[in-house]
């Protein structure tokens, strides 16, 4: 929280001038069982059964979002999901937590910055990684995390996502 507040002093948050994002996020039903075919099926279900019955926000939009498991999709599959959502009149979204290590595997290499392992980027207190809600916190200012954030943000942009939800 303190890191976010300090950043807000330097770069205030952008105002959201649109209606509340409303729709579906894969975590609620699929959790760790998200697959590409299931994501497409949900987009089609919303299009065929719900959108025409006013299951939209005040901007007449539905947000269809991928949660945990999107990283098992190829870049081509992510783009195809976005294209499917657009064709179905939806805004494609994705959820990402770049400031945590859910695997809690200190020896795992950070693929976007070879030579660094997750133990190099953990936030420590009294020599122990700091854990919250089942994940280890990572240093958002570490060059390896910055490289990971740049790489993943560019992937989302190339795939065409219009909505990215991030948690600290």
Map each language-model feature to its residues.
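Carbohydrate-recognition beta-sandwich/jelly-roll modules
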Residues: 1-54
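Alpha-helical scaffolding within the catalytic cores
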Residues: 2-12, 42, 51, 75-80, ...
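Loop/turn elements at helix/coil->beta-strand transitions in domains of secreted/extracellular proteins
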Residues: 18-22, 56-63, 87-93, 158-164
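The substrate-binding groove and active-site-proximal loops of carbohydrate-active enzymes
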Residues: 21-38, 65-75, 131-147, 162
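N-terminal start-of-domain structural block
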Residues: 47, 59-69
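Aromatic-lined substrate-binding rim segments of carbohydrate-active enzymes
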Residues: 72-93
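Active-site-adjacent "subsite" loops/lids of carbohydrate-active enzymes
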Residues: 94, 98-159, 163, 168
